[in-house]
Amino acid sequence: MIYTITFNPALDYISKVDNFEIGKINRTKEEKVLPGGKGLNVSTVLKNLGFQSTALGFIAGFTGKELKTEIEKYGIQTDFIEVKEGITRINVKISSDVETALNGNGPIITEEDIEKLLEQISKFNNEDIVILAGNIPKGIKNNIYEIICSKLEKNGVTFVVDSTKELLINVLKYKPFLIKPNKEELEETFKEKIETNEDIVKRA
């Protein structure tokens, strides 16, 4: 089975506005609400390619329930952990002459919630594939990816990491099957500007 893990999924509220003006009432031309988060995006692409996956991660409140409903409408299996405090974040995307985004913070994830996720992971074996994608919300220790990857490696699980900075660097010793930083994430990780393809190859 393929599993995707998204620590901080979101409902993306996308609105198109002609000539968006700050400080004024703007009428939307088009609106849609979509599940968001790197891991969920991977599950969606896999579904479109004919591969089933199970989406893992944390949800909370009425927005979490809506996120779960929307994901399952796509025919994607879910096994989310419902946390008690806060709501799944809403990210507002305004599309006009330029793109504007307002990203929410997300719910409070406790140590107890983390333990539930680690318990899920402990059942995976060498027939499973795990895709660990995106960043982590505030309050979670930045060694969480390292903890997860050490358990996956111990159980012979194939895993992929799509993240940046310390979250990515700290798991390289566990030899993920694949990492997928884009240009901006490479710049964040190495703390320097990348100008050419040769620069990208050198950092890779």
PLM-predicted stretches and their roles:
Residues 1-23:
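Positively charged, low-complexity intrinsically disordered leader regions
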Residues 83, 94-126:
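Conserved phosphate-binding/catalytic loop of the ribokinase/pfkB sugar-kinase fold
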Residues 127-139:
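Short acidic, glycine-rich surface-loop motifs adjacent to enzyme active sites
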Residues 27-87:
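Substrate-binding N-lobe of the ribokinase-like
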Residues 107-110, 136-140, 167-169, 188:
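Short, small-residue-enriched loops and turns at beta-alpha junctions
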Residues 4-5, 80, 131-132, 159-163, ...:
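General beta-strand structural signal in soluble alpha/beta enzymes
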